[in-house]
């Protein structure tokens, strides 16, 4: 078992990494929260894979448990689904000293976090992420966003969980595409923060190799994320370094209407990382040869490095980013593998990174 502590004063918590964690999660939840009632919020498919195991573990620890299943879709990150969950909690009778558990990926994590922050004016919740992408990213840091009719990610808050429980073995049940999707996010962290993490991907020759070192990949990623959450809890300053590849990647996702079947978050981030690094190397901002190393790793993970979307369309989308202030933006780049930095660029300069 590995524990990584996030020091946020009264909102501090641990990330616990352990294979087979779900089997003794009940005792851990009981010890941490003292709750006698719990509601698991999960999604189609995950309920069958892990839901009943978690219910049994909680109930064996004396915790009365209800499981609420939401559709496995990006469209579930909505106020209508949140309202449905509120109703299910009221019907169940979850008290204010109960606990919510998010069992799933980013969508379930956002729904659960939002409900926890608002139900009974705030109750405890625990993140139990089941995808690599959520294990090393969205489940850590308390950032919660929902979509509304007017647009994506326009409603949200920061509300820290009481703990994040990660079982690396869950990755074995992921389709290959979604395993690689999460690995793309890990490569990103290696690029800007951890050379040795990046080198794990250079040395891996197969998915079996990756799965063997996955606990180490997750540990390194969570350590990085924990550090940046501590020094920049709301992601306004230093934590922006972790947006490496996201500026262009986010534009690609928006242009594709966040359709996972067209492009995943990890795939879009991979393209973003490659394009900014290629341009930065041409400008002398990044050590020569870095782009080719990144390209090798991305291709070994079957992640793309190019997009069919016209550069002018991407540039126009990026110019409208919420991170653009007075025509400028802090762009995350690499000096070399494992060493990232933020560079202020104008909207006009930013457009050149997608050409």
Name these PLM-found stretches.
Residues 199-312:
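Active-site segments that bind and position negatively charged phosphate/pyrophosphate groups
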Residues 16, 114-206:
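A glycine/threonine-rich phosphate-anchoring loop and its flanking beta-alpha core
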Residues 7, 33, 93-95, 118-120, ...:
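Solvent-exposed alpha-helices and their adjacent loops that cap or buttress functional pockets
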Residues 18, 40, 78, 129, ...:
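Residue-level signal for inorganic ion chemistry
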Residues 1-98:
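ATP/NTP phosphate-donor binding region
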Residues 107-114, 135, 251:
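Short glycine/serine/threonine-rich phosphate/pyrophosphate-binding segments
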Residues 86-103, 112-127:
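Non-catalytic interfacial helical region
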Residues 2, 184-186, 286-355:
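C-terminal charged capping/lid subdomain of soluble metabolic enzymes
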């Amino acid at each position: 078992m590995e524990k990584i502590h996030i020091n946020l004063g009264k909102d501090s918590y641990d990330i616990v990494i352990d294979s087979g964690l779900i089997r003794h999660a009940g005792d851990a939840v009981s010890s941490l929260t003292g709750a006698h009632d719990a509601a698991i919020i999960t999604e189609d498919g995950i309920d069958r894979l892990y839901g009943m195991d978690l219910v049994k573990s909680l109930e064996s620890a004396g915790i009365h448990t209800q499981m609420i299943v939401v559709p496995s879709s990006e469209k579930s990150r909505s106020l209508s689904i949140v309202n449905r969950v509120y109703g299910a909690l009221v019907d169940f009778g979850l008290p204010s000293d109960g606990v919510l558990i998010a069992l799933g990926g980013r969508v379930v994590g956002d729904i659960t976090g939002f409900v926890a922050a608002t139900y009974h004016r705030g109750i405890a919740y625990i993140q139990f992420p089941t995808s690599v992408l959520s294990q090393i990213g969205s489940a850590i840091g308390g950032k919660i966003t929902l979509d509304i009719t007017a647009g994506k990610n326009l409603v949200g808050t920061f509300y820290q969980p009481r703990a994040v429980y990660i079982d690396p073995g869950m990755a074995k049940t992921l389709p290959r595409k979604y395993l690689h999707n999460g690995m793309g996010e890990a490569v990103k962290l290696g690029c800007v923060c951890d050379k040795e993490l990046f080198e794990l991907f250079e040395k891996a020759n197969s998915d079996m190799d990756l799965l063997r070192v996955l606990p180490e990949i997750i540990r390194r990623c969570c350590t990085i994320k924990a550090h940046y959450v501590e020094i920049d809890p709301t992601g306004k300053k230093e934590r922006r370094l972790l947006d490496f590849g996201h500026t262009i990647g986010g534009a690609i996702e928006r242009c594709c209407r966040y359709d996972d079947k067209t492009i995943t978050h990890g795939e879009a981030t991979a393209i973003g990382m490659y394009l900014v690094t290629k341009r930065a190397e041409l400008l002398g901002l990044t050590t020569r040869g870095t782009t080719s190393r990144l390209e090798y790793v991305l291709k070994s993970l079957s992640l793309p490095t190019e997009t069919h979307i016209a550069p002018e369309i991407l540039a126009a989308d990026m110019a409208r980013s919420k991170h653009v202030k007075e025509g400028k933006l802090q762009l995350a780049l690499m000096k070399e593998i494992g060493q990232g930095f933020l560079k202020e660029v104008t909207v006009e300069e930013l457009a050149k990174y997608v050409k």
